[in-house]
Amino acid sequence: MLAWRVARGAWGPLRVALRPPGARLGRGGSRRALLPPAACCLGCLAERWRLRPAAFALRLPGAGPRTHCSGAGKAAPEPAAGGGGAAAQAPSARWVPASAASSYENPWTIPNLLSMTRIGLAPVLGYLILEEDFNVALGVFALAGLTDLLDGFIARNWANQKSALGSALDPLADKVLISILYISLTYADLIPVPLTYMIISRDVMLIAAVFYVRYRTLPTPRTLAKYFNPCYATARLKPTFISKVNTAVQLILVAASLAAPVFNYADSIYLQILWCCTAFTTAASAYSYYHYGRKTVQVIKGK
């Protein structure tokens, strides 16, 4: 009998500590009120039961001020049924707003990995050209072109593979690849210096514009961690039609210049005509970005 009274005396504080928000203790509804609610993670379970440090000296993983589960769309916890007033509502400061959670995206998509592969192949191609190993360079360049075709095809046909990071990473990979190729081919006397200077100048200005757009579209406070976080999407870039044509013409010139020493047509008039076409599309592409300006940038809402 003494042990039973001690057990009943210890159960009282535990019932208060484990009481869900808004539940009333009584003979009829005490057992139903103490049934644990359906929780999707330990963080949600700790939040709903309101475990008090005075009763339990423990901290469940995920019970901190982070998002529970995915965190998307949970601006405030739902009050328990039967409760009223401010006592039945949990503080909303522990939840991440839906607008902030929706700005995060998965950067590890297949198109993004293909774009990073293309960036990694660029110095390999430059080394092969400097060593005048044009046969192997043609094969590596074909592989880089295949990654360019695949990442665009996958991003267009699978919605979960499209990302704001990819809209900037794909043209950045093209510019890194083209810049290294043109510098290497100019060193090998296969492309004239003025054409390479025009292409590099345009790409440097576009890359600087991308960094500026990234800075302007970040919500305050702007931090370096947020600026260089690839998961935090703020804007999508939309290339112009003439820019796509220009990229294709530049890559055609690279392929023709790589094949020129192999098939002995380095002094062909057709190659020189291709130089002029590339210069024209490069200048037209630079003007299109200057003319359309903000139309090429789509700011993601909710920032």
Swiss-Prot record:
Key words, A-Z: Lipid biosynthesis, Lipid metabolism, Membrane, Mitochondrion, Mitochondrion inner membrane, Phospholipid biosynthesis, Phospholipid metabolism, Transferase, Transmembrane, Transmembrane helix
EC number annotated for this UniProt entry: 2.7.8.41
Catalytic reactions on record: a CDP-1,2-diacyl-sn-glycerol + a 1,2-diacyl-sn-glycero-3-phospho-(1'-sn-glycerol) = a cardiolipin + CMP + H(+)
Region (Disordered): 69-88
Bilayer topology term: Multi-pass membrane protein
GO CC annotations on file: mitochondrial inner membrane; mitochondrion
Transmembrane feature ranges: 110-130, 134-154, 191-213, 251-271, 272-290
One Gene Ontology term of the molecular function aspect: cardiolipin synthase (CMP-forming)
Disruption phenotype: Knockout mice have severely reduced cardiolipin (CL) (diphosphatidylglycerol) in mitochondrial membranes.
Top-level lineage group: Eukaryota
Localization (cell): Mitochondrion inner membrane
Residue spans of biased composition, Low complexity class: 71-80
Gene Ontology biological process terms in this record: cardiolipin biosynthetic process
Family membership: Belongs to the CDP-alcohol phosphatidyltransferase class-I family.
General function of this protein: Catalyzes the synthesis of cardiolipin (CL) (diphosphatidylglycerol) by specifically transferring a phosphatidyl group from CDP-diacylglycerol to phosphatidylglycerol (PG). CL is a key phospholipid in mitochondrial membranes and plays important roles in maintaining the functional integrity and dynamics of mitochondria under both optimal and stress conditions.
Protein name: Cardiolipin synthase (CMP-forming)
